[in-house]
Swiss-Prot record:
This is 3-hydroxyanthranilate 3,4-dioxygenase. One of its GO terms (cellular component) is cytoplasm. Binds 2 Fe(2+) ions per subunit. Catalyzes the oxidative ring opening of 3-hydroxyanthranilate to 2-amino-3-carboxymuconate semialdehyde, which spontaneously cyclizes to quinolinate. The gene is nbaC. Belongs to the 3-HAO family. Its cofactor is Fe(2+). Substrate binds at E57, R100, E110. Keywords: Dioxygenase, Iron, Metal-binding, Oxidoreductase, Pyridine nucleotide biosynthesis. SUPFAM superfamilies: RmlC-like cupins (SSF51182). InterPro entries: 3hydroanth_dOase, RmlC-like_jellyroll, RmlC_Cupin_sf. Pathway: Cofactor biosynthesis; NAD(+) biosynthesis; quinolinate from L-kynurenine: step 3/3. O2 binds at R47. Its EC number is 1.13.11.6.
């Protein structure tokens, strides 16, 4: 989309672009020339990283439900269910892992990062919750860089092995199930 003073039908845009929503993240930025990152995300996604973003993130769930797994200040995992039609404002710096199941769509808006403003992608052990791996990036292309970080983790057995309990996270990630 170019900078215009015209509205468009978002549901039609999703229908016309849904083939671009591919795992592991299933995201597509709507406008490239904005000071915001406004993107559509579809399910099912295939990710288990936790994103630590220096910006607040606004979630609007268009179809189905989204599950945002967060790490609390006490280090506990907590799942926020964002139901169809709901909005959710995730505060900056909260480690979170958004999970989307099949046939779901949501809009996420966050601000573009300033030069030198870094963010992390972190993996925690499924068994003992120990931090296994962290990647710090200067985010400039959210569609490309998140996929690269996930692929790098998934393809390296050494970093998928927990140094605390020995559990080895599988290379492939199945569809997330809310427990």
């Amino acid at each position: 989309m170019s900078k215009t003073l015209q509205s468009f039908n978002l549901l039609k845009w999703i229908d016309e672009n849904k083939e671009l929503l591919k795992p592991p993240v299933n995201n597509k930025v709507i406008w490239q020339d904005s000071e915001f990152i406004a993107m559509i995300l579809g399910g099912p996604n295939r990710r288990r990283d936790f994103h630590v973003d220096p910006s607040d993130e606004f979630f609007y769930q268009i179809k189905g439900e989204c599950y945002v797994e967060c790490i609390t200040e006490e280090g506990k995992r907590e799942v926020v269910t964002v139901k169809e039609g709901d909005v959710f404002m995730l505060p900056a710096m909260v480690p979170h892992s958004p999970h989307r199941v099949a046939n779901t769509y949501g809009l996420v808006i966050e601000r573009k990062r300033s030069q030198g403003e870094l963010e992390d992608f972190v993996w925690f052990c499924d068994e003992c919750n120990h931090e296994m791996h962290r990647v710090r990036v200067q985010l400039s292309d959210i569609e490309k860089q998140v996929k690269e970080a996930i692929h790098s983790f998934n393809s390296n057995k050494e970093i998928r092995a927990c140094k605390n309990c020995g559990h080895i996270m599988p290379e492939e990630v199945g569809e997330w199930k809310c427990e």
